[in-house]
Amino acid sequence: MDSTDLFDVFEETPVELPTDSNGEKNADTNVGDTPDHTQDKKHGLEEEKEEHEENNSENKKIKSNKSKTEDKNKKVVVPVLADSFEQEASREVDASKGLTNSETLQVEQDGKVRLSHQVRHQVALPPNYDYTPIAEHKRVNEARTYPFTLDPFQDTAISCIDRGESVLVSAHTSAGKTVVAEYAIAQSLKNKQRVIYTSPIKALSNQKYRELLAEFGDVGLMTGDITINPDAGCLVMTTEILRSMLYRGSEVMREVAWVIFDEVHYMRDKERGVVWEETIILLPDKVRYVFLSATIPNAMEFAEWICKIHSQPCHIVYTNFRPTPLQHYLFPAHGDGIYLVVDEKSTFREENFQKAMASISNQIGDDPNSTDSRGKKGQTYKGGSAKGDAKGDIYKIVKMIWKKKYNPVIVFSFSKRDCEELALKMSKLDFNSDDEKEALTKIFNNAIALLPETDRELPQIKHILPLLRRGIGIHHSGLLPILKEVIEILFQEGFLKVLFATETFSIGLNMPAKTVVFTSVRKWDGQQFRWVSGGEYIQMSGRAGRRGLDDRGIVIMMIDEKMEPQVAKGMVKGQADRLDSAFHLGYNMILNLMRVEGISPEFMLEHSFFQFQNVISVPVMEKKLAELKKDFDGIEVEDEENVKEYHEIEQAIKGYREDVRQVVTHPANALSFLQPGRLVEISVNGKDNYGWGAVVDFAKRINKRNPSAVYTDHESYIVNVVVNTMYIDSPVNLLKPFNPTLPEGIRPAEEGEKSICAVIPITLDSIKSIGNLRLYMPKDIRASGQKETVGKSLREVNRRFPDGIPVLDPVKNMKIEDEDFLKLMKKIDVLNTKLSSNPLTNSMRLEELYGKYSRKHDLHEDMKQLKRKISESQAVIQLDDLRRRKRVLRRLGFCTPNDIIELKGRVACEISSGDELLLTELIFNGNFNELKPEQAAALLSCFAFQERCKEAPRLKPELAEPLKAMREIAAKIAKIMKDSKIEVVEKDYVESFRHELMEVVYEWCRGATFTQICKMTDVYEGSLIRMFKRLEELVKELVDVANTIGNSSLKEKMEAVLKLIHRDIVSAGSLYL
């Protein structure tokens, strides 16, 4: 690559080709003969010495890189916030009786309802910027006019673009953000400049391309799968493609005036969010931006970051405007009622909410406060699935919506399988006329005609048409891409009246419905079932209400378990999710940044939003530190030395007593004393003190979800205990037996609150002390009235022992005679003696002086902690991780100790669709040399497939051997990572390259039909196509790699792999193109 292709500060670092024995540079490297750098030859002291030298070298480079950074930004930009204003706008809409056939709001005399919304503006400016308030800006020669009156937020945002200043538009789905993006495109094309429109996913890029092509004509598309008209004035692309263009110094960037980032809140995505951050940092300062986002509460923080790193103004235009107001309803599971809980004015209807909760209470059990009640007929209903009567409830809701003419409806479910099951449940209903069926079938057949004949008979295609003809659709990631697209088109054209969809349908083009239904408001996030967050709920519910068509959008939440009012409010009325950085270092990123002059990995870290968010908190912490110091200086303690000594001894005794408690409650010592009726003092998590309770029973802890789960000794048993002091903030569903985690809303009662008697499950580490008394315990504590009898006994015992219930002596009663334990007890005795000799022990002022000193001591500790936080925030975050990753790259031979990139590093720079380290090692080890193209494709599928599926059958030798060789190299890389102090579990790293589809890919490359390979796996058809598309991307990158290292045989092999993969349904294009 010629350095003249690079823009601004980018200049490629020259890289020496390897020399042969005659000292001549060898351009055609035989990768099979390249020395293996994966063996780390240094051990013990030599390795420590190497690490020490690397750190010294690293520190010098950081200083050097800092000076480069400072040269580029001679003045650190401290953004100035200005031009803050808020506009209140109101409008009148027709009154609506909604689903409950009753007036929901106060109606004006003219029969209208008045609704209001806000538009807020603020701008982050570089210091001394010559700024004119946005309200004073007059658009003279507008790039684009509109046949309708712009909403206030659109008008403000367009004024920002008109005068060439970046803007973040934060607004709800369907609010009209696209109008702002279109103005930026129109202005760029008018000025003969180029504009880039980025989107988070390829499917959305394809849809956006089609939309913008119809609007502007001069539009191109670049997604990795396809390139159309790359010389167009407006280019639509994925963010990954833009990042790749920036790293390669594409000539296109010289002509770009504006970059539009759609769905920029994607930046918080753990996996891909870093791509947005990298791209924004790498873009030249001369470029201006339009950021389109869902509502985010910390938008100004983002604007300040843009202003700081690019030395330009960045406006924030926020609105809570919804073109179609929403009504939010609760539908309790297995019930008949529906309850309006949030009206068009966003008022939470507490009374209706409580009615809905009471309705659930009647379904779950007789006693809403009971922790041991069971569902009727022994059934417990849990959110997140379409089991039990949930399908019947959906049937009921959809029929009601159809009857009241509130269709089309999107039914959101968090499971692909549930979407299909629920849709099949509706298959008896028919929402389409004969004319609609005929038109729909024609559109469907025209789309499917693009596929080869053999693929038109796929089960997924054949089975879905009868549903579609009835006006019922399904949309999830497991569908074939062509089916997803035809369903989107049918939905937009009004042929589908009910669409069952997963969460992914809430991302992308404007495809609203009149009604949105949530089959559950709990979801599995990969680790646990949790309530849907406010941001997730806003994003999905925002699909309700079609602008210009509906007077109201309807949102219905099906709930089958108790929900606290604050949870419901947080979901439907709460703040959207914050935009927090998900920045993390990757090897490809580090190597690409090493490759160009004038920029470095340290530069990326310093300019990341992640770093900015840490540093921005420093002034607040410094203010807090000053307040703490003032409080600290204001406390004077008389006789401070003696008070200090008393405090230190008491804290030491407290620590030793905790050690004693750990020994006493260890299963080996405690279990034999935990007979039914034994009194135990309970403190859950060290803070929730339930006081004294009576043991019911105990059992070994078993995790049915994860049988291999490992617990500490204290966590390995569950003890069921009767307590008198439980308080429930709101009705909570039953506690499962042997579940040590108490649900939200359950806590000890505070003074004045009415507590209840209940059985709670705890672990041994929640036992504060074991009493010397036992109560009578009934055989069946859950029988009617038995808990209350034990509770009464507990109250009586507490009354009889006002000075405290006697506890078991660890030595005399429990016979703990371990030598170390006896020494521990002796230490406590010695300290108690020392404490009694302190001059203040019998002083009347002890309590007062001790309280003052404790407060002063706590302030001192808080100050120390805050100083450490300030220091950590001001330091460059993730710098240690960068050092460790560079060490890995050096030991693998990807770069020199001076950060000069080697040939291996150049290869890794080209790979972003798979693990760059392992793939590079496979290439340089010659692992592909002896493989046939179909074997190579099968091996590469391990990098392209990321989903879970059932275990694949035993692999054929021609596949098992390449897999074994790859895993051996992966294990070596993992060892080098561990030796370089990177947290990695070798087994997890090796097994992250999933082999389950190796045989599927192998047979596909040998000519099997798609129908045949679908029968070989339980993976959804759409997931298979997605894997093949990823595989194609990866193979294309390896073709580029072969060119980079001049390996013609590898290039020919990878080109052959591409031909084998790219056929039939895998090669089918998008309907949007």
Curated annotation (Swiss-Prot):
GO terms for biological process: exonucleolytic trimming to generate mature 3'-end of 5.8S rRNA from tricistronic rRNA transcript (SSU-rRNA, 5.8S rRNA, LSU-rRNA); maturation of 5.8S rRNA; mRNA processing; nuclear mRNA surveillance; nuclear mRNA surveillance of mRNA 3'-end processing; nuclear polyadenylation-dependent mRNA catabolic process; nuclear polyadenylation-dependent rRNA catabolic process; poly(A)-dependent snoRNA 3'-end processing. Keywords: ATP-binding, Helicase, Hydrolase, Nucleotide-binding, Nucleus, Phosphoprotein, rRNA processing. A motif (DEVH box) lies at residues 262-265. Its EC number is 3.6.4.13. Residues 360-372 have a biased composition (Polar residues). The keyword rRNA processing applies. ATP binds at A171, H172, T173, S174, A175, G176, K177, T178. Present with 12500 molecules/cell in log phase SD medium. Belongs to the helicase family. SKI2 subfamily. This is ATP-dependent RNA helicase DOB1. It comes from Saccharomyces cerevisiae (strain ATCC 204508 / S288c). The gene is MTR4.
